[in-house]
Regions:
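Non-catalytic, surface beta->alpha helical segment in thiol-disulfide oxidoreductase systems
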Residues: 59-66
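Short alpha-helical
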Residues: 13, 40, 65
Length: 66
């Protein structure tokens, strides 16, 4: 399975729901990037996705949104 990356925050209820859905679908190795912990990663997310909201999810190189 390709790498799954999710830009998230520690307090985002939608991120929690997205993580639970991914786990239900069999994703065991979710890479979470907490943009509230590391502001430089927020800039990375906004540059990469063109969006400011979380969650933002990538499966491999494919952006599936949030």
């Amino acid at each position: 399975m390709p790498e799954v990356l999710m830009y998230s925050t520690r307090v985002c209820p939608y991120c929690v729901m997205a993580e639970k859905l991914l786990q239900k679908k069999g994703v065991l190795n979710l890479q979470k990037v907490l943009i509230d912990v590391d502001p430089s990663r927020r800039e990375e997310m906004m540059t990469r996705t063109g969006r400011r909201t979380v969650p933002q999810i990538y499966i491999g190189d494919h952006h599936i949104g949030g």
